């Protein structure tokens, strides 16, 4: 396959694009932790900015709920944020100080689930703002990204515990150790094969875990690529950012990893998502990248 790589400039400089997601209407939403705001890129390319009420909130990851609202984590402000469909920003302070919320996703019943890096907890927040937290079994696990699995449980990475965690709606937690020692798992996503896929930022591998907990690992060709985030693409392809190598990686259906260099030097790619046709990724260098299929060599 051949892909066209494009890089889009943002309105302002030194804004720190980090998390990224796409709505079902094709709008691209990004967090900008240095500028303390969230931006939305419309289909016509127009950018709408949403400055956060809390200064220096360090907004990190975001997700779009099934009812079209944008939810996000304010890592330094210790809050969960929300942009309603009318564009109103609401913030919810976590019960415990310095919890450092990070990853975020929607659960099976519409609640929003998130990780607390410093708090060593998994949290959930209801539509009316009620928060409940679940302590992890091991101290200092540093839970990072979180995603909904095909089994309707929430799956998350434990960056410092070298494990993949699973939590049910009732709060039951199971942990699965990663074979590679000190692998530093970060991003995780549900694949189109119904398994969970994750990246190992230190182990330099892509991991796959089944709902039963069976783990397989795939080595990234470029040393010290420092993979950060991962998303499911077309078919059963997986796409991921290589923060250290300045590349975008693709794990194909036959378990081959292909890599696509980013044009600009030191792009620092972080978040990544797929809208059904295009791979979008956020770069700390104040650009948004997109990869579009232009030729399928199988045809």
From Swiss-Prot:
Binding, Mg(2+): 268, 284
Signal peptide positions on this chain: none
Documented effect of changing residue 228 to A: Loss of activity
Binding residue positions for substrate: 228
EC code(s) of this entry: 4.2.99.-
Cofactors, names only: Mg(2+)
Stored InterPro entries: Streptogrm_lyase, Vgb, WD40/YVTN_repeat-like_dom_sf
One Gene Ontology MF term: magnesium ion binding
Phenotype when changing residue 270 to A: Loss of activity
UniProt entry keywords in alphabetical sequence: Antibiotic resistance, Lyase, Magnesium, Metal-binding, Plasmid
Active site per the UniProt annotation: 270 (proton acceptor)
Effect of residue 284 to Q: 137-fold decrease in catalytic efficiency
Pfam families: Vgb_lyase
GO biological process per UniProt: antibiotic catabolic process; response to antibiotic
HAMAP family per the UniProt record, alphabetical: VirginiamycinB_lyase
Note: Has unequivocally been shown to cleave the ester bond of streptogramin B antibiotics by an elimination reaction and not by hydrolysis, therefore is a lyase and not a hydrolase. The olefinic dehydrobutyrine thus generated in the N-terminal position has a Z stereochemistry.
Subunit structure: Monomer.
Role this protein plays: Inactivates the type B streptogramin antibiotics by linearizing the lactone ring at the ester linkage, generating a free phenylglycine carboxylate and converting the threonyl moiety into 2-amino-butenoic acid.
Family to which the UniProt record says this protein belongs: Belongs to the Vgb family.
Protein name: Virginiamycin B lyase
Organism: Staphylococcus aureus
